[in-house]
Amino acid sequence: YDKSSKGIDYLKKNFSVEICSNISDAVKESDLVVIASPLSSYKEILLSIRTSLKENVILTDTGSAKKEVNKIISNLNLKNVNWIASHPIAGTEYSGPEAGFASLFKNRWCIISVDKKKVAEDKIKSLENFWSKLGSKTKRMTFEDHDYVLSLTSHLPHAVAYSIVRSAINKEDKFKDDVIQYSAGG
């Protein structure tokens, strides 16, 4: 399933895939459902599929924030669903099926976050196996730890660039303008 007609056209042209026009139909018999869309669309997607999810399904995602998504999942009170958050640290600046390539996950980390009181260990291992077969190395973290660690790593390059620019502004240096112009891509 893909909302984008451009994405669907690309998939049909380049791969032998079955495409559903209805998201509820797409998940009906699935043992594993992966939400790979912008975080802002999660609630809408979950509301659309919640009555169609197979009992005991593994539900995961590929998003970069976990604590808020976990709240959405909890508030929807999904029954007989194994919610295990995933965050593959892979990809490029591009999105959609066109941005995929065979080695996308090879030797890349995938962080798994789960409430072990709500999900059986065999379900967690099954999802870890899924990511491993795609080439990923998996690491478990709590929802909170994930968000803390990733907020530091994703914001760190911006903080460094800001520090460089700030230092240049405070100096009387012949390269001051060049440092400011070329920091963080200009």
Where do the PLM segments sit?
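Rossmann-like NAD(P)(H) cofactor-binding subdomain of soluble oxidoreductases
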Residues: 45-98
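Short beta->alpha hinge that forms the Motif I/post-I loop of the SAM-binding pocket
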Residues: 3-4, 37-38, 62
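Short acidic-hydrophobic, aromatic-tinged amphipathic segments that line or gate anion-handling sites
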Residues: 18-23, 139-141
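Short, well-ordered alpha-helix to beta-strand connector turns
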Residues: 17, 30, 56, 107-108, ...
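Internal alpha-helical scaffold of NAD(P)-dependent oxidoreductase catalytic cores
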Residues: 104-186
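Generic beta-sheet signal
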Residues: 1, 61-62, 86, 113, ...
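Rossmann-like NAD(P)-binding element
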Residues: 23-53, 57-58
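NAD(P)-binding Rossmann-fold cofactor-contacting core
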Residues: 1-15
